[in-house]
């Protein structure tokens, strides 16, 4: 058991999901904006807490956000942020 605790685990995702996630995230962003919320703040609240109550039900956004695993979304966001010039 001690050896297992010393190994670094690998974490990976299916790259094909990226395009689908972007489309869903844009729809969610627009729905939040249309309802007068700050989309970034609301999405951060959701990502930190996992509580879908941070996302409006307008345009079915709350159900859409549940289709994206939070860890996958965080991975994609970090990748884009770190690869920016």
UniProtKB/Swiss-Prot annotation:
Q: Which InterPro entries match?
A: IreB
Q: Name one Pfam family in it.
A: IreB
The organism sits in which domain of life? Bacteria
Name the family: Belongs to the UPF0297 family.
Enumerate the NCBIfam families for this protein. Answer: PRK05473.1 (NF003997)
Q: In its UniProt entry, what is this protein called?
A: UPF0297 protein CHY_0540
């Amino acid at each position: 058991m001690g050896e297992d605790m010393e190994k670094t685990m690998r974490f990976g995702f299916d790259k094909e999901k990226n395009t689908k996630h972007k489309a869903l995230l844009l729809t969610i962003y627009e729905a939040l904006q249309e309802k007068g919320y700050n989309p970034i703040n609301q999405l951060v609240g959701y990502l930190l807490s996992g509580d879908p109550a941070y996302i409006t039900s307008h345009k079915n956004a709350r159900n859409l956000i549940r289709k994206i695993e939070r860890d996958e979304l965080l991975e994609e966001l970090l990748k884009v942020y770190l690869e920016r010039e």
